[in-house]
UniProtKB/Swiss-Prot annotation:
Compositional bias segments (type: Polar residues): 755-769, 776-799, 845-855
Modification Phosphothreonine, positions: T715
Keywords: Cytoplasm, GTPase activation, Phosphoprotein
Gene responsible for this protein: RALGAPA2
The keyword Cytoplasm is annotated on this UniProt entry: yes
PANTHER family listed in its UniProt record: RAL GTPASE-ACTIVATING PROTEIN SUBUNIT ALPHA-2, TUBERIN
Protein name: Ral GTPase-activating protein subunit alpha-2
InterPro entries: ARM-type_fold, Rap/Ran-GAP_sf, Rap/Ran_GAP_dom, RGPA/RALGAPB_N, Tuberin/Ral-act_asu
Quaternary data: Component of the heterodimeric RalGAP2 complex with RALGAPB. Heterodimerization is required for activity.
UniProt domain Rap-GAP: residue ranges: 1635-1843
Positions carrying Phosphoserine: S373, S376, S379, S486, S696, S820, S821, S1593
Record's function text: Catalytic subunit of the heterodimeric RalGAP2 complex which acts as a GTPase activator for the Ras-like small GTPases RALA and RALB.
Length: 1873
């Protein structure tokens, strides 16, 4: 025997204990020593051997102490002695239970315990008495008498007296019973308190709760204290006590406690709404405490807490942790005597206990009391761990106990709000059972023990049970959990009343059903809205329950019965909680707090259930009825919208194969994503585990949770249902046509759909408008199991994104068969085809099978509100990090055993989803389509919603939903590799599905205005898209009616909405009868523009008007269906509409306050003028339009003025049409420009705004274009002015005024201020047809947007300084260029070489005998026949003497050399050749030393007319006369205005009278006479005579620069006066480089434009670039853009094209004297190899402006042609009526340009010229964004300036003369001159 003392000590103590001679106190002392030092087993043996003496020692000492206490009172030593005696008493009870069981010392022990239990004792003694009494009672068990049972029933004060055979009993009457007979002489001694309570003792305020806690705790702690020989009796002790407790206490604690609760056959009646109890408010520590008057409520709470303790995770404490702040928590007597068996102090005992309570047992609690923490409820001493586990095992050991526990928990759900914190603990227990550690009774019953009928009643199919059993197999219990114990012996003694049934397995489903039903009571308690604290408590508890519901939905396999119970419970809860109070003023805070979460849970559960089991139509009808009655809740609308978003994502994936988070177009738009994850709709296998997130609703937020993939076998259902569905499909095929008559009526709450109905939705008739609810017929292929996961049943990790993420605008859609007529609906073939496609898609998808739910990346599709309702922090225990942490993907399949994974080949190929009557679970095309359709209509008819705000919210969401449908449509049949175009999709979304709702909404009363506006917005969006299938006539009739009502509505907001959202695209679609709305649109746009509201859609209105300007000429009779302002009756006819339309445009071009709208109005007028000129209609308002455009040139807003300038520039190409319209109009245009420049110049010169100067430049260039286009005769015509002053009876020609204004631009506007009529003024333009002072209203100018890259920012300061410097010189520089251009090209251009050649191609090395190279080289500078000069510091002039090859150019006299002058100035490079005009004839001497004269002709100008060689000159011919005649013929611009030849005498001047003639003759005769007289008088004067000289012999000039010097002499360049303006250049290598660089620069503005042709069905670059020809209309258009030039010989701008044919043989080219445009036409370039395609793409893609001619049925996407350029795309869509719709897309930083605008519609005649002009302006707009961009002449000016500054040579006159005499002295020959 092991002990802490030596063997000898123990033996001595034993002897002394057993020595009867020793006094009892000594024996007690040695007995205590034994108890402390001997093991329990030896002690039991010792006690059983010496039980009598031991008891004697105890009893004698106890009696002695009792007497001592009565005599001496209470002191410390006696209390310690009492502790020692009671310790011995406890050991007697513990070690001798078998003897006590047979009533050993029955009366003595009973008497002793009564003394301890006496109510007069102190609390500590009473607690110790209860503990020891429970030990005794456990030992007695069934052998106890009625008295002991009654004492147990009375241990807790406050309960009613217990009825017995002696009447009502209390603890007092049982301890000291009153004598039954009054005169009896013998009666028991009165039992008095052992240790009476002292006056200062602290007493619990609620003694009922205090002693109930003591009783319950000791029932557990003492349960295993007795040392039975038969260990099984340990269980029976607790069971005996617990049975007594249930018999005597439970009826008072739970008056409504029912024994009918049975989770094995559960009663699932849905609870009813309970009224709230009356709450009593008391105050403690300045905190309100709420309680009810319900009896024993506090005790009831205590008992529920006690039960909960056994099922929550417990916190075990060591003995040292049982102190609080250094003070013992419990009475010391209990700690010492009880050997550490400390009862846990209840929360109510902390902090001094509760306040005074009345005797009605009303319970009370504070907020901290309600917020029970795990530690306060479940903290247990470590040494009691085993006994708590034993009691827990007992409570789960039989069906009776299991049912009892569940009924207690049921009662907990019925607690009032003030005690609902306890309910939350019960919820936590259920959460643990359901989601974590399943108790034994939740295991599935063994098949052999359960009849098949029971299984059917539970709603299990064979597959379900297998899944559930496989699920539960993962929850292994420790050995202590599943044990059962036999109660046979106990029952034979009558202490156990439960039926022995240890097979407690009920299965998961039963508990889920019971929990669902019972937990509803929390919601169905009327909330206490007036007490916010209680309301919050109830809300939190409800949220905790909903969290479990969510987890059940997400993670658990539930059978049909459980799903139906959940749906019914959720429906009833929703119906009860969300009913709005009748008084609208009262806010239902409870409902508001739960609304979002409750609606979300309901909807998610509904959809999830339909994926797993078949839900009846009746339930769907209930669902519809409940939700449609709650549409006044905005939260419902929000959650419905969220669910629809997720359903749409699933629909997109399962039906259309489009991932909303990974859309093809999104991928293509990201240039960085070069590696495609797959082709078509194949998903990345590596993303398998994240597929299916669209319906997750962010229920998952824990990143470390792994989730096993779930599968359900599809082989368990038979084919009869499929055959039935097929028959319905065939039957429905005949009904399609009838369905067209009721297009798009969204059935509210469509019930169960058959496959046939689903089929119909997929197919759609020719309307594609989905007349019936939708479903997919392509589910057959969806049974393929996930190939990646089928190989392994291991969980796949899921990466989650936490938080609330915004919802993207994704697309959604439903299935629509592309078809043109019902006759094409071969349903059988389509069914097979679709099934095959789906099977193929499923095999290729990784996780995108029926096992997963939705989209990839949940973060992008989540509906985060799940996470907005935070769980109670106390729920987040260490084992349960987040309540929502491991929620599975919502709407996912149930888990199955890995053995159930089957290959798709094993599945029935004709099976369909559960919702369609099949057996496939999860997402398939049919289930996705049906659920999408049903949930869409679950709110009922949305037009019946009463709240206008909610109604508007619904229609706002419908627009978002439609946008997603449209997005899906846009992403169908997209080429991902951009190498080939997919075939058109079989299924297309029904974009007109909402039409019936929208049409009805448009007719609602005005209080639903917001919803109406949203409806009109969606109608416009719906009908301005390209239609895959044209709507039928009935639909169009409804549509036109609604639009007519809207366009003619008195409500300005409706007008604004339609005009804003119905762009001109509508007119381009060409619906039958669309022109009937043209008049309505014009009127509506006019009404929008007539308002003063700047926020109105003014630009959209002007765009609509501008798009219609060509319609009146195309449609001869356009009706105006409504009377218009200024007209009393409805009007029809072309002219009336045109007149009305143009008047509106004219008005808005002058008065429109919106800048962008004003620009479009001006452009529209320009397009209309061109249209009228092209059609030769001679419309009288053309002059008005020109007047408006001309006046707009001086408008202060330079953006608008620039547009007007562009329009005037456009009209240059129509000058002949203008001249035909009115002869003076072209000249008037130039006059307007001249006068406008003169008007704006003074302010622009000194303006600090760069745009002012740039606009003057634009005007000058436009003026130049007009000058170059108009015939010289028009420019030489005198200007036309309204009032001519007498002294100026004849005005100067227009060209003179042009040069004057240019001179003013160069020299400054002050030049003409002192001279009257020096320039043309605006007043001079005034006439009956033109008002130069037409008033213009101001516009609200837009702020210029600055776009700077980060790299540019550092240089901004430098850039701005340089810009400022240049802008000062910009106007003079431009004017100089214009003058130089006019001087060189007016009347000359185009030259004989064609418009491609503007400047000379000749250089100094050509025809130079002293240079051998073909290129300009330094050798040239050493030539003795070349000298380079600078003239006026602005022009470079090269003089070159070249050998002649005979008389050229019709020169009558030849010479050995010619002179060539090469001029380089700001406007270009020019070359002139000179011949000696007059010199010695061939073979003759030169006459008398006369210097030869020169003929100078343009080098590149051919000679026309009669030519004669000098050898043909006959004797007597006047050579000079012949020369003058030849010049007049070859250069008619040299003729005088009289047009007489140069060799003809001028006409006699008129106006000389006879007297004047006579006087002149007399003067001449007098002069002659005087001369004769002088000669005669000096004839003989020798001084007057000179010696005669002989004629010198002529010498042939051989100097290499001789003739050049002669020409310089003729020009006066060698004179002293010219020295300051005429200099030499330094000849060096730098100059050579500069000259080469200068010659390489363009002398015109150049643009290169790409032209693409897109045929029908082409959506990839390879197909588009491979087109070698286009349609006839396209070819005609390209031919109209310019002239087709041969690239191998083309001398103009090439734009990078090659001459070797690698980029094509020809290209369209357009040029004026100022602009060159080359068109890179894709169909002109070869595409016979990959290299050719690459080269073609490189040329086309590098252009900034793209013209796209698209004949495809879908809109052009910029990304099809991958390029970083293409800043502007002008897309041309041919229309059915031979007009063309223009769409212009540009980068946001590109400024506005015209004349075409986005949305313009033009006729074929105008198209080429307008597109060409727009391209040029677009290219200019793009180039203006380039920092420090320079025009061609600015560039030339800078180069010239640099050359002159760096290479001009300053020298003396002598040196200069020497250089002119001999440019290269080493070559000079002496005596040559």
């Amino acid at each position: 025997m092991f002990s802490r003392r030596s063997h000898g000590d123990v033996k001595k103590s034993t002897q002394k204990v057993l020595d009867p001679k020793k006094d009892v106190l000594t024996r007690l002392k040695h007995l205590r020593a034994l108890l402390d030092n001997v093991d329990a087993n030896d002690l039991k043996q010792f006690f059983e051997t010496n039980y009598s003496q031991i008891y004697f020692i105890f009893y004698e000492n106890f009696i002695a102490l009792e007497n001592s206490l009565k005599l001496k009172g209470n002191n410390k030593s006696q209390r310690e002695e009492l502790d020692s005696i009671l310790f011995l008493f406890e050991k007697i009870l513990q070690f001798l239970p078998e003897r006590i069981f047979f009533r050993w010392h029955y009366q003595s022990i009973g008497s002793t315990l009564k003394k301890l239990l006496h109510t007069g004792n102190s609390i500590k003694i009473r607690c110790e008495g209860i503990r020891l009494f429970l030990l005794w009672l456990q030992a007695l068990q069934t052998n106890c008498a009625e008295e002991q049972v009654l004492i147990f029933a009375c241990l807790v004060p406050g309960f009613p007296a217990v009825m017995s055979s002696r009447g009502p009993c209390t603890l007092e009457t049982l301890i000291n019973p009153s004598p039954s007979v009054a005169d009896v002489k013998i009666y028991p001694e009165e039992i008095t308190p052992l240790l009476p309570a002292i006056s200062g003792e602290k007493i619990a305020e609620d003694q009922t709760c205090f002693f109930l806690q003591i009783l319950l705790k000791y029932m557990v702690i003492q349960a295993a204290s007795l040392e039975w020989k038969n260990k099984e009796n340990q269980d029976t002790g607790f069971k005996f006590l617990f049975t007594l407790f249930r018999k005597y206490y439970l009826p008072h604690l739970f008056p409504s406690f029912t024994k009918l609760t049975n989770i094995y056959k559960p009663v699932l009646d849905i609870p009813h709404l309970r009224p709230k109890p009356v709450y009593i408010t008391t105050t403690r520590d300045n905190e309100n405490i709420y309680s009810t008057k319900i009896p024993y409520m506090a005790a009831r709470v205590v008992f529920i807490k006690w039960i909960v303790t056994f099922f929550l995770e417990k916190k075990y404490l060591t003995a040292t942790q049982n102190t609080k702040n250094g003070v013992d928590v419990l009475p010391k007597i209990i700690q010492t005597v009880g050997g550490g068996a400390v009862q846990e102090r209840a929360p109510e005992l902390d902090g001094g206990g509760p306040t005074e309570q009345d005797k009605s047992h009303s319970n009370s609690s504070t907020l901290s009391d309600r917020r029970l923490s795990n530690s306060s409820l479940c903290s247990i001493e470590e040494e009691h761990r085993m006994v708590y586990e034993m009691v827990q095992r007992i409570l789960l050991s039989t069906r009776g106990y299991v049912n009892f526990v569940n009924e207690v928990f049921h009662q907990a759900f019925l607690l009032p709000s003030c005690e609902i914190a306890v309910t939350r603990k019960v919820v936590q227990v259920y959460r643990k059972w359901i989601l974590q550690d399943k108790p034994v009774f939740m295991e599935e019953p063994d098949r052999k023990d359960v009849a098949q009928e029971d299984a059917e009643k539970l709603g299990f199919s064979e597959t379900d049970s297998k899944e559930a059993s496989s699920e539960s197999s993962g929850h292994k219990r420790s050995s202590s959990w599943g044990r059962t114990y036999s109660f046979t012996s106990a029952m034979s003694r009558g202490c156990v009343t439960e039926e022995e049934n240890t097979n407690v397995k009920a299965g998961v489903q039963a508990l889920l059903q019971v929990f669902l039903t019972n937990s509803a009571n929390i919601f169905l308690l009327e909330p206490c809205a007036e007490v916010p604290v209680l309301l919050k408590e109830q809300v939190d508890a409800c949220k905790a329950v909903l969290i479990i519901f969510r987890r059940m939905i997400m993670e658990l396999t539930m059978n049909k019965k459980t799903w139906e119970q959940m749906l019914q419970i959720l429906l009833r809860i929703t119906e009860a909680v969300m009913q709005k109070p009748k008084d609208k003023q009262i806010k239902d805070l409870f409902a508001q707090s739960l609304a979002g979460l409750l609606f979300r849970t309901l909807m998610v559960a509904w959809i999830r259930a339909n994926l797993c089991v078949y839900i009846s139509r009746e339930l769907w009808d209930d669902f519809l009825g409940v939700l449609s009655s709650l549409t006044e809740w905005e939260e419902l609308i929000n959650e419905w919208a969220n669910i629809m978003d997720s359903l749409t994502a699933v629909l997109a994936r399962t039906v259309y194969g489009v991932e909303m988070t990974n859309l093809p177009l999104d991928k293509l738009s990201e240039q960085k994503e070069k590696k495609q994850r797959g082709k078509g709709c194949v998903l990345d296998p590596q993303k398998g585990t994240t597929v299916g997130r669209s319906f997750s609703l962010s229920w998952r937020s824990h990143p470390d949770v792994t989730e096993p993939m779930r599968f359900r076998s599809a082989t368990t259902s038979g084919a009869p249902g499929v055959e039935k569905a097929r028959n319905i499909v065939r039957q429905k095929a005949t009904e399609v046509e009838e369905c067209q008559q009721s297009e798009n009526a969204p059935a509210a709450g469509s019930g169960h759909l058959t496959v046939g109905q689903q089929q119909q939705v997929l197919r759609s008739s020719s309307t594609s408008d989905i007349p019936e609810p939708l479903c997919s017929d392509s589910s057959q292929g969806q049974k393929a199991e996930n190939t990646q996961n089928s190989s392994s049943s291991e969980p796949q990790p899921i990466q989650e994104n936490k938080g609330h993420v915004k919802r993207e605008h994704e697309g959604i859609t439903i299935l629509v068969r592309r078809s043109s007529s019902p006759a094409e609906l071969d349903l059988k073939d389509d069914l097979q085809q679709t099934q095959g496609k789906c099977r193929e898609r499923q095999k290729s998808e990784s996780t995108n099978s029926d096992t997963t739910l939705g989209c990839t990346n949940e973060a992008e599709l989540s509906m985060g509100p799940w996470q907005t309702c935070e769980e109670d922090p106390e729920l987040n225990t260490p084992t349960d990090v987040v309540a929502d942490a491991d929620a599975r993907h919502w709407l996912q399949l149930s888990p199955t055993d890995a053995s159930n994974l089957t290959d798709s080949s094993e599945c029935l190929t004709d099976d369909c989803s559960i919702i369609a009557g099949g057996s496939l679970t999860g997402w398939h095309p049919d289930s996705a389509a049906v659920l999408w359709r049903r949930v869409l209509g679950i709110l009922g008819d949305v037009n019946n919603i009463q709240s206008p705000k909610i109604h508007a919210r619904v229609f706002c969401y419908l627009y978002e939903l439609w946008y997603k449908l449209a997005k899906i449509r846009d992403n169908l049949a997209i080429s991902l590799d951009n190498q080939s175009s997919p075939s058109p999709p079989v299924l297309i979304p029904p974009l007109r599905m909402f039409a019936s709702w929208l049409f009805k909404a448009a007719t609602l009363p005005n209080e639903y205005k917001e919803g109406k506006l949203q409806a009109y917005r969606l109608i416009c969006a719906m009908m301005t898209r390209r239609q895959d299938v044209l709507p039928n006539s009935d639909f169009l009739v409804h549509f036109y009616l609604v639009m007519h009502l809207g366009l003619t509505s008195e409500d300005q907001d409706i007008l604004n909405t339609i005009i804003r959202h119905c762009p001109p695209r509508f007119f381009s679609l060409g619906f039958p009868g669309f022109s009937m709305l043209v008049g309505d649109f014009i009127t509506a746009a006019a009404r929008v523009l007539s308002t003063d509201i700047l926020t109105a859609p003014r630009s959209e209105a002007v765009t609509v008007l501008g798009s219609l300007v060509c319609f009146p000429n195309t449609y001869q009779e356009i009706p105006l269906l409504q009377s218009v302002p200024e007209v009393n009756e409805a009007i029809t006819g072309t002219e009336d509409v045109k007149h009305y339309l143009i008047n509106i445009l004219l008005k808005n071009a002058t008065e429109e306050p919106n800048e962008y709208a004003r620009c479009i109005a001006v452009c529209s007028l320009g397009v209309w003028i061109c249209e009228e000129l092209a059609q030769c209609t001679s419309h009288p308002q053309v002059k008005e339009a020109i007047n408006v455009i001309g006046v707009t040139l001086k408008f202060p807003n330079k953006i608008v003025a620039q547009v007007a300038c562009d329009v005037l520039q456009l009209l240059v190409s129509y000058w002949e049409k203008l001249q035909m319209f009115e002869t003076s109009l072209p000249r008037k245009m130039a006059e307007i420009l001249v006068a406008t420049v003169a008007f704006l110049l003074p302010s622009a010169e000194y303006s600090s705004v760069e745009t002012d100067k740039k606009f003057i430049v634009s005007l000058l260039l436009c003026l130049l274009d007009w000058c170059m286009a108009l015939p010289v005769s028009v420019l030489l015509h005198p200007v036309s002015t309204a009032v001519l002053e007498e002294q100026h009876s004849a005005r100067a020609p227009l060209l003179d005024y042009i040069y004057r204004v240019l001179h003013c631009c160069v020299c400054g506007s002050s030049t003409y201020t002192q001279q009257s009529h020096y320039i043309l003024t605006l007043a001079d333009l005034s006439s009956t047809d033109y008002d130069p002072f037409l008033p213009l209203a101001n516009v609200k100018s837009s702020e210029p947007v600055q776009y700077h890259s980060s790299a540019e920012l550092g240089n901004l300061l430098t850039v701005e300084e340089e810009k400022k410097r240049r802008s000062l010189e910009l106007i003079p520089l431009t004017a100089r260029m214009v003058m130089a251009h006019l001087v060189n090209h007016l009347g000359h251009y185009p030259l004989s070489g064609g418009p491609a050649i503007l400047h000379s191609l000749v250089s100094e090395n050509h025809d130079n005998a002293h240079v051998e190279g073909s290129e300009l080289s330094f050798e040239v500078f050493r030539s003795p026949n070349l000298q380079l000069f600078v003239f006026n510091d602005s022009t470079l002039i090269s003089y070159l003497q070249t050998p002649t090859e005979g008389p050229v150019g019709g020169s009558p006299v030849g010479s050995l050399s010619d002179v060539r002058v090469i001029v380089r100035d700001i406007s270009g490079k020019y070359s002139w050749d000179g011949k000696v005009l007059y010199g010695p004839l061939e073979g003759c001497l030169a006459p008398n030393g006369r210097n030869p004269s020169f003929l100078i002709s343009s080098w590149h100008r051919d000679t026309f007319g009669p030519q004669k060689d000098s050898s043909q000159v006959e004797e007597g011919d006047d050579v000079l006369d012949k020369l003058l005649e030849n010049i007049g013929h070859t250069s008619p611009e040299c003729l005088l205005p009289s047009q007489l030849n140069l060799n003809e005498p001028s006409l006699t001047p008129c106006g000389m009278n006879y007297d004047q003639e006579k006087e002149i003759i007399e003067v001449i005769l007098r002069q002659n006479a005087q001369e004769d007289e002088y000669i005669q008088s000096h004839n003989f004067d020798s001084a007057m005579k000179v010696t005669s000289q002989g004629q010198p012999s002529p010498v042939e000039p051989r100097g290499p620069f001789y003739f050049c010097r002669l020409l310089l002499d003729d020009l006066g360049m060698n004179s002293w006066d010219r020295r300051k303006n005429f200099h030499l250049l330094k000849k060096n290598s730098k100059l050579l480089r500069e000259l080469k660089n200068l010659d390489s620069r363009q002398c015109r503005e150049t643009h290169k434009i790409a032209v693409f042709y897109i045929a029908e069905g082409q959506e990839d670059k390879c197909s588009i670039l491979s087109n070698e020809r286009g349609s006839q209309a396209y070819e005609d258009f390209v031919a109209g853009l310019g002239w087709e030039v041969d690239l191998s010989t083309h001398c103009g701008f090439m734009g990078g094209l090659q001459r070797n044919g690698s980029t094509g043989q020809t290209a369209p080219y357009y040029a004026t004297s100022t602009v060159e445009v080359i068109f890179h036409v894709s169909t002109r370039m070869p595409s016979d190899s990959d290299d050719s395609l690459t080269k073609k793409l490189r040329h086309l893609g590098n252009d900034e402006v793209h013209i796209v001619w698209s004949e495809h049925s879908r809109d052009y996407r910029r990304g099809i042609i991958p390029t970083a350029f293409g800043d502007v795309s002008i897309i041309i869509y041919p229309m059915k009526n031979h007009m063309f719709f223009i769409a212009i897309t540009k980068k946001p930083e590109v400024p506005f340009f015209g004349p075409l605008f986005d949305g313009a519609i033009v006729s074929g005649k105008l198209l080429p010229s307008l597109v060409c002009a727009t391209c040029i302006n677009a290219s200019r707009a793009v180039k203006c964004l380039i920092p420090l961009y320079q025009s061609f002449y600015e560039e030339r000016a800078l180069y010239l300036e640099a050359i002159i500054q760096n290479h001009r040579e300053v020298m003396t006159f002598e040196d200069f003369a020497a250089q002119v005499f001999s440019p290269s002295p080493s070559y000079s020959l002496s005596g040559t001159d």
